[in-house]
Swiss-Prot record:
The lineage of its organism: Eukaryota, Metazoa, Ecdysozoa, Nematoda, Chromadorea. This is Probable small nuclear ribonucleoprotein E. It comes from Caenorhabditis briggsae. It comes from the Eukaryota. The gene is snr-6. Disulfide bonds: none annotated. GO terms for biological process: spliceosomal snRNP assembly. Keywords: Cytoplasm, mRNA processing, mRNA splicing, Nucleus, Ribonucleoprotein, RNA-binding, Spliceosome.
Amino acid sequence: MSQRKIQKVMVQPVNLIFRYLQNRTRVQIWLYEDVTHRLEGYIIGFDEFMNVVFDEAEEVNMKTKGRNKIGRILLKGDNITLIHAAAQEA
């Protein structure tokens, strides 16, 4: 039996953000020092400081599950804790 070596490739953060942008994936952003609110929308641009232009942005209150549509915004990178693909709405 031959031994195959599986090589794992590290994914750079900028590449993952770019993939979200290219595929128009709806993402959720966790805010720094604000656990009660999150932002959901589509990344349409970003820079080397992780400043993000967000389209169709919604503010989600995690306590009440209420949503507030805020449209297109520029979110400064210092405010971002985590970016991930948003759960599909039923």
